[in-house]
Swiss-Prot record:
Similarity-based family: Belongs to the purine/pyrimidine phosphoribosyltransferase family. PyrE subfamily.
Name of the protein described by the UniProt record: Orotate phosphoribosyltransferase
HAMAP family for this protein: PyrE (MF_01208)
Organism superkingdom: Bacteria
Subunit organization: Homodimer.
Gene from which this protein is expressed: pyrE
InterPro entries referenced in this protein's UniProt entry, alphabetically: OPRT, Orotate_PRibTrfase_bac, PRibTrfase_dom, PRTase-like
PANTHER family per UniProt: OROTATE PHOSPHORIBOSYLTRANSFERASE (PTHR19278), URIDINE 5'-MONOPHOSPHATE SYNTHASE (PTHR19278:SF9)
Length: 194
């Protein structure tokens, strides 16, 4: 599966949107990938995550556990783990930091794939990787369905992406005039407190 195949899954679900969006990172962009519209379809999710699992295996060999950041990473993390034949757990924000909760644990010496939905700056992924390491985990790869940074994001581990895009994203005080003229939509989840 290549980048165009991934984008076709998003288009088919009505999930490739144009306008003026505030991303989870706080950056503004003319393009938003509404992954929840894709993940509501098991067949689309299966195709994407099966392909991501194959890329992970090709890059690092077998893994013992997938760990994902809540909320957005839970579905792709679980489905990717299913194709990798390993368990899936997730970290949640508590006091502003990602932590393992709900009796989840990381087995000593486990080879871990941190699986995310979409990476823009890599901040959520990096925070997830740090939480895994703090819990004693060995993160061998960070993986995502879409890297919209064009390869510039730093998730704190080698990044494997099913699709890599170079989508513009701007700080609020550096918007191009044509983007500033469009009303803002804020579909992100990062500002949810938990």
């Amino acid at each position: 599966m290549n980048t165009e195949d991934v984008l076709n899954e998003f288009r088919g679900a009505g999930a490739l949107r144009e306008g003026h969006f505030v991303l989870s990172s706080g950056l503004h962009s003319p393009v938003f990938l509404q992954k929840n519209l894709v993940f509501q379809y098991p067949d689309r999710t299966e195709r994407l995550c099966k392909a991501l699992a194959a890329k992970i295996t090709e890059a690092v060999g077998p893994v013992d556990l997938c760990v994902s950041p809540a909320v957005g990473g839970i579905i792709p993390g679980y489905e990717t783990a299913r194709h990798l034949g390993c368990p899936s757990v997730y970290v949640e924000r508590e006091g502003g930091e990602f932590k393992l909760r709900r009796a989840f644990s990381i087995p000593e010496g486990a080879r871990i794939a941190m699986v995310e939905d979409i990476v823009t700056t890599g901040l959520s992924s990096r925070e997830c990787v740090e939480a895994i390491r703090k819990a004693g985990g060995n993160v061998v790869v960070a993986a995502c369905i879409v890297d919209r940074s064009g390869g510039r994001a730093d998730p704190g581990a080698p990044l494997v992406a099913l699709a890599r895009l170079d989508v513009p994203a701007y700080p609020a005080d550096q918007l191009p005039p044509e983007l500033a003229a469009i009303p803002i939509e804020d579909p992100g989840s990062r500002r949810l407190k938990g």
